[in-house]
Amino acid sequence: MITMKMFLFLNEACIFIDSVCEGIVFWGLCLFVCAECENASYRGAEVPYKTLFRSCDTSIFGVAECLNLVAIDPRSEAYC
């Protein structure tokens, strides 16, 4: 079980720009969800692609693709 961690979930309102899976991936609006208390908050984000991993099959723009789940850098981690 993951405790006291903040994760960034790609929201349907997010702007997703992926340059051949390299460099920086940008989100215009992102949703942070605390795994411990399930509180959520929105903010813009800019996260290096190397922190990404594919979690589940979904469709964001009408094309089958994977939802991106981004682990937040410990230096910017937030606690409840």
From Swiss-Prot:
Keyword Transmembrane: yes
Bilayer-crossing regions: 13-33
Keyword vocabulary terms for this entry: Membrane, Transmembrane, Transmembrane helix
GO cellular component terms, A-Z: membrane
Keyword S-adenosyl-L-methionine: no
Main location: membrane
Entry membrane topology: Single-pass membrane protein
Protein location: Membrane
Family: Belongs to the UPF0377 family.
The name this protein goes by in its record: Putative UPF0377 protein YMR324C
